[in-house]
Amino acid sequence: MLALRRFILNQRSLRSCTIPILVGALIIILVLFQLVTHRNDALIRSSNVNSTNKKTLKDADPKVLIEAFGSPEVDPVDTIPVSPLELVPFYDQSIDTKRSSSWLINKKGYYKHFNELSLTDRCKFYFRTLYTLDDEWTNSVKKLEYSINDNEGVDEGKDANGNPMDEKSERLYRRKYDMFQAFERIRAYDRCFMQANPVNIQEIFPKSDKMSKERVQSKLIKTLNATFPNYDPDNFKKYDQFEFEHKMFPFINNFTTETFHEMVPKITSPFGKVLEQGFLPKFDHKTGKVQEYFKYEYDPSKTFWANWRDMSAKVAGRGIVLSLGSNQFPLAVKFIASLRFEGNTLPIQVVYRGDELSQELVDKLIYAARSPDFKPVENNYDNSTNVPQEIWFLDVSNTIHPKWRGDFGSYKSKWLVVLLNLLQEFVFLDIDAISYEKIDNYFKTTEYQKTGTVFYRERALRENVNERCIARYETLLPRNLESKNFQNSLLIDPDHALNECDNTLTTEEYIFKAFFHHRRQHQLEAGLFAVDKSKHTIPLVLAAMIHLAKNTAHCTHGDKENFWLGFLAAGHTYALQGVYSGAIGDYVKKTDLNGKRQEAAVEICSGQIAHMSTDKKTLLWVNGGGTFCKHDNAAKDDWKKDGDFKKFKDQFKTFEEMEKYYYITPISSKYVILPDPKSDDWHRASAGACGGYIWCATHKTLLKPYSYNHRTTHGELITLDEEQRLHIDAVNTVWSHANKDNTRSFTEEEIKELENSRHEQS
């Protein structure tokens, strides 16, 4: 028993000694950690002081110079940083120095490279340092240039304000005002504020009392001041998040949290009621009907485009968006008639600037969309309907900065539609496009389900892009510093796309190769496409900028190529359906065969661009309307023609007969020809009918050279089935007979009656 008591007392004594020993050991470890940390920080401070006092960029590691500026050569002009990312290699080098001299076991976790920092810290540094390097930075395409080895762009050694520049000043000017810099900034904006786990924009421009707690930012600034000591890291404090938004997107009007409602589109309802400024309709996603009206409260923790995205999602899920001007009113009436006939239930938003569409025409379009008296012409289709359309008009005049309102004319008006509509997901249609497929089905395509986009192919026309334009486009793509530090990468590997066989490439890779290597334009046909705006706002912004920039505005025809180029530049996934477009109608046999080699050929000449399903069995949609010609005065002008046109004109006994053929008779839906994209099998109709807008597609069979019976077929001749043709013909008949003269404005009594009827139905 005595022995047991001694054992217990010894154990207690041992425990009483162990606890102080453990506590003491812990204190020693903490002290050593502080000493080591202090040693490392002191070492780097000493190194920084020495570099400031004794070293210049001439002493920098060539590898760092290459990563930052693209060259190991130290040039006073070319090594002036114009992007915050050009500073990062110097910071990373200092981290390497700390790691190599550190005694810490977890030194890699303690001393982090820039790309290992939190997204918040990287974004803070990037956007604050923009102001450190140059608080006059801009994303205005009116001031930016493409930095290629070309004299075009900088006017005889003058800057955007007309001030003369010497050679070195011009070089620096080109670097500072390079379009690439704007694209890099917007991609960083996308990464920081628009994707998963976004950064709070208010943390970029915080109140001063929060600044002292930013340990990581302090380290970044101290380290970089060693190499670049003449910059003011506090420059950004002069600005706030709203001034930042305007510098990022100059075409958007100025606003604050309190004034945001003033720039919300002015909205006209399907019954002609103009909503109070700032108020928006909220649609039921299932019924497509308006549940209530609400005023969106701007969230200052988010950016402008994040707020616009969230606001759009609260208004409506899916819908149709249109670009429309007064001169397109007759086509708009036909468009609405075809949607009524096909039973569309998706809401429609017409996005326009106030002066583009008069109130009289708005009232008439509302009549065409809602009146029970606006009926489709009689036809033989058993499943016809006449569903009133939910058409809303969004005047975005106040959303656009006054200095930019005149920059969105013609094809460029489409950018306002795709950016400023109030839908989470949308299908855009040209006003002369006709979809034979239910609009909602475009959201169900394989391409859309995979990427949140579906675009369609153009005709395979043999028309090249200017080599200078290709060089400009190439400068816009993400580079290594972005890829490393913000994970903004080019989703298509250029080497793979250019070197692999065409049949092994995806549609997107094939288009990349055709455009950038073979310089072939006409890749995308933008008459109908679908985009999930909740995922893909920024690619549309970049696409608009490419089209608005003076040196790429006319590189391709209209807006179409800019869509996929915007997605490519943004590093976002996108999808084009793989089938090239074709021509629809009756075919004629060609008689001008190429000697004995071309044994057979047929062609279809039409004013429509026809788009088939992936299996090439179903006609999805056409661009160009449902009759021979969509242009109002073309028949009168063509009737006056002689020469080559006389043979075409001789088909008709009178002008009235030709006019009916042009504007009333629906196009034939018997056949579609999809020409061989590798052959030159598209040509403009020689007669020049419909103002030269008729194109011919050829399907041919050739005898192989020096062969007796080996034949090759080029292109495809598709016969549409009878059931499909009945539907297509009925839609085209309704489209062709819908007449603007059958529209008018509702009376107040009619509007009340329609609204009451609508409430009863809901």
Swiss-Prot record:
Molecular function GO terms recorded: alpha-1,3-mannosyltransferase activity
Top enzyme class: transferase
Pfam family, one: Mannosyl_trans3
Glycosylated residues (UniProt): N50, N225, N254, N383
Compartments (UniProt record): Golgi apparatus membrane
Primary location group: Golgi
Lumenal face of the membrane: 34-762
Transport in keyword set: no
EC number: 2.4.1.-
Involved pathway(s): Protein modification; protein glycosylation
Gene Ontology CC terms: Golgi apparatus; Golgi membrane
Alphabetized UniProt keyword annotations: Glycoprotein, Glycosyltransferase, Golgi apparatus, Membrane, Signal-anchor, Transferase, Transmembrane, Transmembrane helix
GO BP: N-glycan processing; protein O-linked glycosylation
Transmembrane segment boundaries: 17-33
Protein family per UniProt: Belongs to the MNN1/MNT family.
Cited function: Responsible for addition of the terminal mannose residues to the outer chain of core N-linked polysaccharides and to O-linked mannotriose. Implicated in late Golgi modifications.
Additional record remark: Present with 1780 molecules/cell in log phase SD medium.
Protein name as catalogued: Alpha-1,3-mannosyltransferase MNN1
Organism listed in the record: Saccharomyces cerevisiae (strain ATCC 204508 / S288c)
